[in-house]
């Protein structure tokens, strides 16, 4: 401690991970502090509330061993900051930005506040460039657009971790492969999940263009609140200082929100819906709204937050509030997963509100929008007929109805259930045509005659042309 550094010794009480310090109203909200006990051991902490009477500090480690009479607090930094550098690409960090890959600390080019800076709405450019994830259901029916924030709604026990890893290794902006990067932040991981992501990124070579932030379930709750902000600060730096197109994958936001609730409970705040704090909407918006494209800047930040819906309830506050802020959703389906379909993405409740901006002639392919609409209509019809067959049997169906039933089966098996293949958008559209061509031309009411003349009749053996397995 320097001679000019002030210490705060009047610790009023300790509640769980929180310290309440009297006469510390001059500490700033968000400041990083150092907490010492009688033995001289130091712990980090962050100021999460300041009033005229006291300051509330969230301790980054356990509070065991801290004594009210001997504990002291001193200021380290006015706000939580992260040292950022282009050399972070290819590295693994914990939730606080400390290296966990056995390599030295990154030499920082800048130290930036993890809260970021508000993006001027007038400076935002319209997102209109297609990002290819290599997953047919996403690319064709719920297209991800550069600068968009498109969440994935999953559930407990569903393979959203595998889906996240697949998107991370396959995603690219066609024509910009050299300046595309992935920032991956995972919160509340078990040790098995940490091993899975570490091995998967290394095995597939995805780590070479990625920055990983891995927060474990046994880490302090406050670290889960800092992890996505560390990731987004890194993404903004790579995008707007070095011109990268950055895809940020955040998983699992449910763990983040539960940490928010845990800290709110320790602070004895009045709870909102289902015990979550009333400011959760604002807090989530402070994360999601950091995605975008800025006029005059070469890079961009695109977000794919992943959250597991408790009890598969899409009206739960976490997915509900997320839906208000973001631009659509991709829904992982338990029924498809039980059939062994991977990735089990159900296109019917899924939606990309910006899809129309980034697909079509000159962007993907002229027939893209028509194919997407026709797949939605035909699959919905096939599912309705499945329900009818469960009641009346197939004898009551027409020949066309039976073709729709077969279409629904083929759609799930070949289009949705692609496994670990990395498909280009042309591959995915070829698969779609191969399945749609089993329906009579008269049923393809959402596709132009020119497209039907050009593509109708695609054979099943052509469906896999250009596809490759990464298994």
Swiss-Prot record:
- Kindly give the InterPro entries that the UniProt entry links to this protein: ATP-synt_VA_C (IPR055190), ATPase_a/bsu_AS (IPR020003), ATPase_F1/V1/A1_a/bsu_N (IPR004100), ATPase_F1/V1/A1_a/bsu_nucl-bd (IPR000194), P-loop_NTPase (IPR027417), V-ATPase_su_B/beta (IPR022879)
Gene Ontology molecular function: any one: ATP binding
Pfam families, A to Z: ATP-synt_ab (PF00006), ATP-synt_ab_N (PF02874), ATP-synt_VA_C (PF22919)
Q: Name one GO biological process term.
A: proton motive force-driven plasma membrane ATP synthesis
Tell me the SUPFAM superfamilies matching this sequence: C-terminal domain of alpha and beta subunits of F1 ATP synthase (SSF47917), P-loop containing nucleoside triphosphate hydrolases (SSF52540)
Extract the PROSITE patterns matched here: ATPASE_ALPHA_BETA
Record key words, sorted: ATP synthesis, Hydrogen ion transport, Ion transport, Transport
Give the top-rank taxon of the lineage listed in the UniProt record for this protein: Bacteria
Which PANTHER family does this entry report, sorted A to Z? V-TYPE PROTON ATPASE SUBUNIT B
The UniProt entry's sequence similarity note says: Belongs to the ATPase alpha/beta chains family.
This molecule's function is given as: Produces ATP from ADP in the presence of a proton gradient across the membrane. The V-type beta chain is a regulatory subunit.
* UniProt name for this protein: V-type ATP synthase beta chain
The beginning of the lineage is: Bacteria, Thermotogati, Deinococcota, Deinococci, Deinococcales
């Amino acid at each position: 401690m320097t001679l000019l550094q002030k210490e705060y010794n009047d610790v009023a009480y300790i509640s769980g991970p929180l310290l309440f310090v009297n006469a510390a109203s001059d500490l700033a909200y968000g400041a990083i502090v150092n907490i010492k006990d009688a033995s001289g051991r130091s712990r980090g902490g962050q100021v999460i509330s300041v009033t005229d009477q006291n300051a509330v500090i969230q301790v980054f480690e356990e509070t065991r061993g801290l004594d009210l009479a001997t504990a002291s607090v001193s200021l380290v930094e006015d706000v939580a900051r992260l040292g950022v550098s282009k050399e972070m690409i290819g590295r693994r960090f914990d939730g606080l930005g400390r290296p966990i890959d056995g390599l030295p600390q990154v030499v920082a080019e800048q130290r930036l506040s993890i809260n970021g800076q508000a993006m001027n709405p007038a400076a935002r450019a319209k997102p209109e460039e297609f990002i290819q994830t290599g997953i047919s259901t996403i690319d064709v029916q719920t297209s991800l657009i550069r600068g968009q924030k498109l969440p994935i709604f999953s559930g407990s026990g569903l393979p959203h971790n595998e889906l996240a890893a697949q998107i991370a290794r396959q995603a690219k902006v066609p024509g910009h492969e050299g300046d595309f990067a992935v920032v991956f932040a995972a919160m509340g991981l078990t040790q098995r999940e940490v091993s899975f992501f570490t091995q998967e990124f290394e095995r597939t070579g995805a780590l070479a263009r990625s920055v990983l932030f891995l927060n474990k379930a046994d880490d302090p709750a406050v670290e889960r609140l800092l992890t996505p902000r560390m990731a987004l600060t890194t993404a903004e730096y790579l995008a707007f200082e070095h011109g990268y197109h950055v895809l940020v994958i955040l998983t699992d936001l449910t763990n983040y929100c539960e940490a928010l609730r845990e800290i709110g409970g320790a602070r004895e705040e009045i709870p909102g819906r289902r015990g979550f704090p009333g400011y959760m909407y604002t807090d989530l918006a402070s994360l999601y709204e950091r995605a975008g494209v800025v006029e005059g800047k070469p890079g961009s930040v695109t977000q794919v937050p992943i959250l597991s819906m408790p009890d598969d309830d899409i009206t739960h506050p976490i997915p509900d509030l997320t839906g208000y802020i973001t631009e659509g959703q991709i829904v992982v389906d338990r029924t498809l997963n039980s059939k062994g379909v991977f990735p089990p993405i159900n296109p019917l409740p899924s939606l990309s509100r910006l899809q129309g901006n980034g697909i079509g002639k000159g962007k993907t392919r002229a027939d893209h929008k028509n194919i997407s609409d026709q797949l939605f209509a035909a699959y919905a019809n096939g599912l309705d007929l499945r329900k009818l067959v469960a009641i009346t049997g197939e004898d009551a169906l027409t020949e066309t109805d039976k073709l729709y039933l077969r279409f629904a089966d083929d759609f799930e098996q070949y289009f949705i259930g692609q496994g670990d293949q990395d498909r280009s958008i042309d591959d995915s559209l070829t698969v779609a045509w191969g399945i749609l061509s089993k329906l009579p031309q008269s049923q393809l009411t959402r596709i132009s005659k020119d497209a039907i003349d050009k593509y109708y009749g695609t054979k099943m053996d052509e469906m896999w042309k250009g596809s490759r397995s990464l298994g």
